[in-house]
């Protein structure tokens, strides 16, 4: 059994233990590709899977607008109310942090294991909800930049 297979099995098990279905499913999918000798698709997935995933994420967020469940008046409230302005600022900060997290994970993919373990600890002992590696990566990137700045 290759080291890559062991790592994917470990990630899948950690995802299951940490109740992170996304990590468990992604690791299982890659294991399936590996066991069926379809690794030739890895470069395509590496280039395009994140983009495809983000499209599905944005589609799921836009469905309430497309279905008419969010009225134009409600949308305008987000531009003139304090909670709405805070939500806009939070979205800007979160997306910037997610971008930093993605860049960090692309440079240091080995950090994923630590983030998954941290998610498991957060769920098991602090009542957390595993939301995915980008936000954890964003926070890690912020802390890495802070440590570099403090040196």
Curated annotation (Swiss-Prot):
Membrane topology: Multi-pass membrane protein
Domain of life: Bacteria
Keywords: Cell membrane, Membrane, Transmembrane, Transmembrane helix
Cellular compartments annotated: Cell membrane
Cross-referenced InterPro entries: UPF0756_TM
One protein family per Pfam: DUF441
Family statement drawn from the similarity comment of this UniProt entry: Belongs to the UPF0756 family.
This protein's name: UPF0756 membrane protein Moth_0120
Originating organism: Moorella thermoacetica (strain ATCC 39073 / JCM 9320)
């Amino acid at each position: 059994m290759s080291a890559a297979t062991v790592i994917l099995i470990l990630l899948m098990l950690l995802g299951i233990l940490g109740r992170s279905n996304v990590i468990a499913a992604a690791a299982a999918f890659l294991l399936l590709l590996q066991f069926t000798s379809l690794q030739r698709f890895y470069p395509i997935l590496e280039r395009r899977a994140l983009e495809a995933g983000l499209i599905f994420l944005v589609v799921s967020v836009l469905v309430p607008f497309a279905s008419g469940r969010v009225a134009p008046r409600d949308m305008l409230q987000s531009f003139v109310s304090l909670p709405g302005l805070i939500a806009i600022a939070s979205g800007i900060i979160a997306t910037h942090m997610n971008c930093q997290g993605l860049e960090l994970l692309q440079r240091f993919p080995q950090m994923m294991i630590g983030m998954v373990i941290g998610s498991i600890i957060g769920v098991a002992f602090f009542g957390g909800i595993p939301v995915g590696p980008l936000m954890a990566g964003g926070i890690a990137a912020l802390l890495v930049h802070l440590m570099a700045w403090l040196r």
